[in-house]
Design a protein with these regions (language model features):
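Nucleotidyltransferase catalytic core that binds NTPs
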Residues: 1-209, 218-220
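Phosphate/ribose-recognition catalytic cores of enzymes acting on nucleotide-derived substrates
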Residues: 197-273
Length: 273
């Protein structure tokens, strides 16, 4: 969506290493913003973005005007009946309709062999994978790890909204993520136990207000009570002041058990790609 940072750069660098040409979409998509959200104030700096893309190895930056992507009387959207009613979809009801629509259009225009998405927007990653499967796009979706600041905060364009005090307060998200991940990796399998511990860390921060902290089946985005034999997503959205931030971790029991498929975590066996 533009105002690129080191997280985006890591996607471009990986894509450039694995492909002949890389096209970067730099487009603030109006259809994924609700009427009270930050479309107008969302940070933009196209020249800065182009420099980052060039340094990372991109061949082309796709930067259309909204009027080029959406005709004045446009009335066709890509909507998903499942995966979009939990987590961010609960409080952002039109968000994923906008995401699916614009990504479908980008795929039709660019015709990529692979598309790279960051894990920070993990629900979006699951939604795009399902859309690609359901609509028979001949595209490999590659999920890439969250890139963090040195103190743990997940990189985000919206971090620029934070005051110095809020920036410090925002570290409660990564502290909660790391604590929950440590519990799960140590063998805790009860979702409520993990989530309660994570919520307690966030609730101890006066500037933080929880939107959600939930654990779901990563492929289907359905809440679970216990970690069993499928990859799980433990995700949160938290307001720090007026700024809504997200963070998460993904746990795959197959990786702990030692997956025997030989895929190295990059095939459908281990990551749903």
């Amino acid at each position: 969506m533009g105002f690129l940072h080191e997280g985006h750069k890591s996607l471009i660098v990986r894509a450039a290493a694995e492909n002949d040409r890389v096209v970067v979409s730099d487009f603030v998509n109006p259809t994924q913003f609700g009427p009270t959200e930050d479309l107008e104030s969302y940070p933009r700096d196209f020249e800065r973005d182009c420099k980052l893309c060039e340094e990372a190895g991109a061949a082309l930056v796709f930067h259309p005007e909204p009027s080029e992507m959406y005709a004045p009387n446009a009335c066709t959207y890509v909507n998903m009946d499942e995966l979009t009613h939990e987590l961010c979809g609960l409080t952002r009801p039109i968000h994923f309709r906008g995401v699916c629509t614009v990504v479908s259009k980008l795929f039709h225009i660019v015709c990529p062999d692979r598309a790279y998405f960051g894990q920070k927007d993990a629900q979006q990653l699951a939604v795009i994978r399902r859309m690609v499967r359901d609509l028979n796009f001949d595209i490999q979706i590659v999920g890439c790890p969250i890139i963090r600041e040195e103190d743990g905060l997940a990189k985000s364009s919206r971090n620029t909204y934070l005051s110095a005090e809020e920036r410090t307060a925002a570290l409660c998200l990564s502290r909660a993520v790391f604590a929950g991940q440590k519990m799960v990796e140590a063998g805790e399998r009860d979702a409520k136990t993990v989530l309660d511990a994570m919520r307690a860390i966030i609730e101890a921060e006066p500037l933080a207000k929880i939107d959600y902290v939930k654990m779901v089946d990563f492929e289907n985005i359905v809440q679970i009570d216990k970690i069993e034999d499928v990859p799980v997503l433990c995700a949160m959205a938290v307001y720090i002041g007026k700024t809504r931030l997200i963070d998460n971790f993904i746990y795959d029991p197959a990786e702990d058990a030692g997956c025997g498929c030989g895929c190295g975590g990059d095939s459908c066996c281990c990551c749903g790609a």
